[in-house]
UniProtKB/Swiss-Prot annotation:
Family, per entry: Belongs to the FliO/MopB family.
Protein name (database record): Protein MopB
Single GO biological process annotation from the record: bacterial-type flagellum organization
UniProt key word Nucleotidyltransferase: no
Transmembrane stretches, start-end: 31-51
Start-end of Polar residues biased regions: 104-119
Role of this protein: Required for both, motility and virulence.
GO cellular component entries: bacterial-type flagellum basal body; plasma membrane
Organism phylogeny: Bacteria, Pseudomonadati, Pseudomonadota, Gammaproteobacteria, Enterobacterales
NCBIfam families in the record: FliO_TIGR
Keyword ATP-binding among UniProt keywords: no
Length: 140
């Protein structure tokens, strides 16, 4: 058996291997590649932070005990009417991008704490996703 394997020529000699080598990366190519990856990661982090804030997952700032927003109602794209409680007095304010105008003053009234805008609980993501993905049925 050993003699038969010695006498037969190996087909390896007829095949030649060709190695394709890539040119080495220059410093400018490497810097561009690393910079673009870093910029992509930063944009991804900013996008996640923006989504967390919009969906209500970001922690809310501590409430100021001297000033409490009782209610708020948008009346335009950047205009809103806000009721603020200060020293047992409700101030009805008109708020725009340029100014805040006092509209009316009322004595403070007892409010339901659950309806207060400052005590809103964060929305459950699962419920929010189901609400967004729910498609209205078409009626013809």
């Amino acid at each position: 058996m050993a003699i038969a394997s010695i006498s037969s020529p190996a087909p390896v000699a007829s095949q030649q291997s060709t190695l394709v080598t890539e040119p080495p990366l220059t410093s400018s190519m490497l810097l561009t590649q690393v910079g673009s990856v870093l910029a992509g990661i930063l944009l991804f982090i900013l996008l996640i932070a923006w989504l967390a804030r919009k969906l209500g997952f970001a922690p809310q700032a501590k409430q100021n005990k001297l000033l409490k927003v009782v209610s708020s109602c948008p009346v335009g794209q950047r205009e809103r009417v806000v009721i603020v409680e200060v020293d047992n007095t409700w101030l009805v304010l008109g708020v725009t991008a340029q100014q805040i105008t006092p509209l009316h003053t009322l004595p403070a009234q007892p409010t339901n704490d659950s309806s207060s805008t400052g005590d809103t609980k964060p929305v459950d993501f699962n419920q929010l996703l189901k609400k967004v993905l729910k498609r209205p049925e078409k009626s013809e």
